[in-house]
């Protein structure tokens, strides 16, 4: 029963410790904003493709080819 307060204090100290990034950045790391922009662009292309293919078959072929 005497260990419980010590355990609680240790948990509080661990939870309040500052977090540190364990991995150092390399020159190959890309910023998160760039990653989000790529995802956004890809989703936009897929949305356009889906809408276009529903309305016109010719448009769908044009998107597939380039």
Curated annotation (Swiss-Prot):
Keyword hit for Hydrolase: no
Q: Which residues form the propeptide?
A: 20-48
User: Which cysteines does the record link by disulfide bonds?
Assistant: none
Tissue specificity here reads: Expressed by the venom duct.
GO CC, alphabetical: extracellular region
Q: After translation, how is this protein modified?
A: Contains 2 disulfide bonds that can be either 'C1-C3, C2-C4' or 'C1-C4, C2-C3', since these disulfide connectivities have been observed for conotoxins with cysteine framework V (for examples, see AC P0DQQ7 and AC P81755).
Give UniProt keywords alphabetically.
Answer: Amidation, Cleavage on pair of basic residues, Disulfide bond, Gamma-carboxyglutamic acid, Secreted, Signal, Toxin
Subcellular location(s) per record: Secreted
Chain positions found as Asparagine amide: 65
Q: Where does it primarily localize?
A: secreted
Tell me where on the tree of life, at the top rank, the source sits: Eukaryota
Which GO terms fall under molecular function for this chain's record? toxin activity
Range of residues in the leader sequence: 1-19
Q: Which residues carry this modification: 4-carboxyglutamate?
A: 57, 61
In which family does this protein belong, per the annotation? Belongs to the conotoxin T superfamily.
- Domain notes, please? The cysteine framework is V (CC-CC).
Q: What's the name of the protein?
A: Conotoxin mr5.2
């Amino acid at each position: 029963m005497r260990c419980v307060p010590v355990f609680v204090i240790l948990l509080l100290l661990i939870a309040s410790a500052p977090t540190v990034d364990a991995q150092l950045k390399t020159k190959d790391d890309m910023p998160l904003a760039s990653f989000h922009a790529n995802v956004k662009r890809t989703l936009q292309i897929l949305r356009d493709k889906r809408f276009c293919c529903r309305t016109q078959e010719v448009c769908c072929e044009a998107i597939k080819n380039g």
